[in-house]
A protein has these predicted regions:
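N-terminal Rossmann-fold NAD(P) dinucleotide-binding loop
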Residues: 5
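Glycine-rich FAD pyrophosphate-binding loop
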Residues: 13-36
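Glycine-rich active-site loop/strand segments that organize a redox cofactor
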Residues: 32, 36-66
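Flavin (FAD/FMN) cofactor-binding and adjacent substrate-gating region
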Residues: 47-53, 77-163, 168
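Flavin-binding catalytic cores
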Residues: 111, 233-235, 271-306
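Helical element adjacent to the flavin cofactor pocket in flavoenzyme catalytic cores
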Residues: 137-201, 205
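C-terminal catalytic lobe of FAD-dependent flavoproteins
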Residues: 142, 148, 293-323
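Central helical "cap/lid" subdomain
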Residues: 190-237
Length: 323
């Protein structure tokens, strides 16, 4: 019953109003990354997009950005910006001192490549905002703005999506973990620890947890660490921000900072399906808060959490018919 599962259920009911659609959720609330993501409505930073071109070519990158952009608009149109807390605040990529910034020379090329999607140039240098946001000038070298990014309120969005699905007639059962799927001549038997369900068609929208049902699928889990500061008076940071090829990400939420990432510091331990903290990564997040993001501001950490994502052989959605 995360973003993918509920969105699929809503799409089915929108197209087939008389259908009987049931969503089965293993947790009391959606368990994976949907309720634990930090609320970034992003389509890809300049350095990330250039890296993706090396993996999938220019046409592949354009299709990926288009899918992200259109997917966000489907969510916004379906639920309404107010109901998901959407803010078109823009996205920013911080280029750190000492970091190879040769990719900035390709900014115009990237704008030209993506221009047909947006009918405008979406990337621009805005180094003057480094001081405006209060970042450390000894650590932040350059700042790149992406006009088409924003942020959402994750809790508000999931609550709205849940209510919208139920309004359409989607049934949702929580606290029922699916243990197996077995095909029969009459349809598919969905086994849980408590009882079995029967369906003609099943959509598997379990993301990182799909391997428990299909061990051979090419998906790897990736845990993300996130921390939240206590409210900060006169907070200068406004918007969504990324650095180190998107491995670190932060944004303001009201008068707090939500900061996550650092998975690249410990890939092995973060490739797990178990929720929990990683002290090595949390220490680095604290260091970046002190030295880069809030160098002249006293702050305290309020709490932290982890969420589990899934990664395939590339960044494209894994959508296929199993049987």
């Amino acid at each position: 019953a995360g973003i993918t599962g509920l969105s699929v259920a809503c799409e089915l009911m929108e197209q087939y109003a008389d259908a009987s659609v049931l969503v089965i959720e293993r947790g009391l609330l959606p368990t994976g990354a949907s309720t634990k993501n930090a609320g970034f409505a992003c389509i890809g930073s300049l350095s990330e997009n250039l890296h993706d071109i090396s993996l999938m070519g220019e046409n592949g990158l354009v299709k990926l950005v288009q899918d992200r952009y259109e997917g966000l608009h489907i969510l916004r149109n379906r639920l309404g910006d107010h109901n998901i807390g959407y803010e078109a605040c823009g996205g920013y990529e911080i280029v750190l001192k000492g970091e190879d910034n040769g990719f900035i020379d390709k900014l115009d090329d990237m704008n030209a490549l993506l221009y047909p999607l947006f009918n405008k140039n979406i990337f621009s240098l805005c180094n003057e905002k480094i001081a405006e946001f209060g970042f450390s000038a000894s650590h932040a070298n350059k700042l790149i703005h992406n006009s088409e990014e924003g942020q959402i309120d994750t809790g508000k969005m999931m609550n709205s999506l849940w209510m919208y699905a139920q309004k359409l007639g989607v049934k949702i059962i929580t606290g029922a973990e699916v243990t197996s799927l077995d095909e029969s001549e009459q349809g598919i038997i969905i086994a849980t620890q408590e009882m079995n369900f029967f369906a003609q068609k099943v959509f598997i929208c379990t993301n990182a947890f799909t391997k428990s049902l299909f061990p051979n699928i090419e998906l790897k889990p990736g845990r993300g660490q996130v921390l939240v500061t206590k409210p900060i008076q006169h907070l200068k940071v406004k918007g969504t921000f990324f650095f180190d090829e998107g491995y670190y990400y932060f944004k303001n939420f009201e008068d707090r900072i939500i900061f996550g990432g650092g998975r690249n510091l410990d890939f092995d331990n973060e490739s797990t399906l178990h929720f929990g903290s990683n002290q090595k990564i949390l220490t680095q997040l604290n260091t970046y808060l002190k030295e880069l993001i809030l160098p002249e501001t006293t702050f305290e950490i309020d709490y932290s959490w982890s969420g589990i994502m899934a990664f395939g052989t590339n960044k494209l959605p894994l959508v296929e018919q199993i049987s």
